Amino acid sequence: MKKMMLLLAIMLLGITNASAQQNDEDLKIKPLLGLWQYAEEVATPDGGTTFIGKQIYKNITWDKKYYVTAGVNIPIKQSEAQETKTSTITFITQEGDIVLGSDNGYLEYINNHYLDNSLNNTISWLRYRFDEKNPNILYLEYNLNGNDENWVSEVWLRVMPYGAK
């Protein structure tokens, strides 16, 4: 009976420790969760800046998966007499896994890149920071060709927090 209780105590301790580690990982990824829209930061006439959203979205989920989708506008005209309408088709361009690194960086394991197969099964290191005044603005940087001169900067706007309906 004592052996059984000792075994049960060891199992519970192991589960508690694994659960605590999982919660730490959850806290690290929580600020990145949600649906993000790629944006271009442009100068305004008054000297400020504004963002122009593009039809590219990145969804980062609790299970540390990410999906990038893109939308393409296609003109549709069913007959000569009908006015041309525009329809947007959205498709997944990239999917993969995220491994958190330091406080301001993570690895993207690109499992599938549907527009550039040479990127399949590759790893990309990303540095990130949030806007000081708005945590829904994310600045990402990644190294394009593996040398220090080719860092690319992107701006992403959170359009929907994780779990929102």
Across the structure, where does each feature detected by a protein language model lie?
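Positively charged n-region of N-terminal signal peptides that target proteins for export
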Residues: 1-4, 19-21
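Sec-dependent N-terminal signal peptides
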Residues: 4-16
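Edge beta-strand at a domain terminus
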Residues: 21, 95-99, 103-104, 139-165
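N-terminal helix-cap/turn-to-beta initiation motif at the start of protein domains
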Residues: 21-37, 165
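Short, solvent-exposed loop/hinge segments that bridge or flank secondary-structure elements
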Residues: 27, 35-72, 114, 119
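Residues that flank catalytic or metal-binding motifs in active/ligand-binding sites
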Residues: 32, 53-56, 63-64, 94, ...
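Contiguous, well-ordered beta-strand patches that form the walls/edges
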Residues: 42-47, 69-134
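Short, solvent-exposed coil/turn segments at beta-strand boundaries
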Residues: 58-68, 100-104, 129-138, 159-163
